[in-house]
Amino acid sequence: KDLEKEFGLTLFKRKNNVLTLTQHGKYLYDLSMPLIQEYNNVNERMNDYINKHSTLNLGIPPMLGTFLFPPIFNVFANENPGFQFKIKEYGSFANKKAVLDGEIDIAFTVTNECEVGDELEYIKIGETSLIFAVNKNNPLASKKVISANDIKNTPLILMKEDSLQYQIITSLFKEQNITPNILLTSNQFYIIKELLQSSDNNCGAFIFKQLIKDGENIIGIQFEKELKLDVLICYKKDAKLLSTTKRFIEFIKNNI
C-alpha cells in the first residue's frame, strides 16, 4: 500500500485475501529484480568479507579424491587465499544423499549412466574407468584382459557398499551367476594399495586407471567389459547457493 500511495498506481489486485500483480505491478517487479539480485550479491560478499575465511563442505569418494582433488585444491587455494574445505569421504551414493540432506554443499561422484534428476544438478568434469589391479608377481599379472570367471576364486578387495564400484562389480558377478570371493571391503584406499603392493597374498581390487603408477608393484589389467565412468560434481538443484559454493562451481567449470 505504501508503494501504491507513493507511485499513485494500483500495483496489486486483491480478491479473497489473494494478491496478484497488475500490469503496473508487473512492470515494477521487472524493474526491481536486478536491484534485488545485486543486493543479494552484495550481502553475500559482505558476509564473506566479515567472516574472512570462506568454508565449503565437500564430499569426495576416497578413491576418486586420491588423484582428482589435490591438483584442484592447489590451484583453487592459490587463487582464493583464506578459503577452507571441510572434506567428507563418502561413497558416490552416500555423497548424493549428503547433498540432498544439506550435510555437504557439493559432491564429487562417478556414474556409469546419464545422470538426470529433479533434485540434483550435475556437471561432468572428466572420465575414468575401473581396471583390475594385482601385484606384479600375481599369476594373473601376465593377462592383458580378464573376465569374472578368471577371478572367481581370487580374494577381492572392494570399496564399501555405499560406493558405485561395489555395486558395479557385484552386479557383474551376479549376471554370470558367480559368487565373488570378497576378502575385504574398505573405503581406505591406503589399505587397499598396501595389500596390493604386498606379494604375500594373491588378492585383487578394481581401482581407477589413474591410480596405476609406473615403478610400483601393482599391475592394471583391462576387464573384458570396459568399465567406463563419468566423473561429475553435483549440488542441490534450485537451492540458494552460498557465494563460496558458486565460486567453486565457476572455478570447476572454467578450469576442469
Residue ranges and their predicted role:
Residues 4-21:
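A short LG(V/I)-centered, amphipathic sequence patch enriched
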Residues 51, 55-80, 84-88, 93-96, ...:
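N-terminal winged-helix
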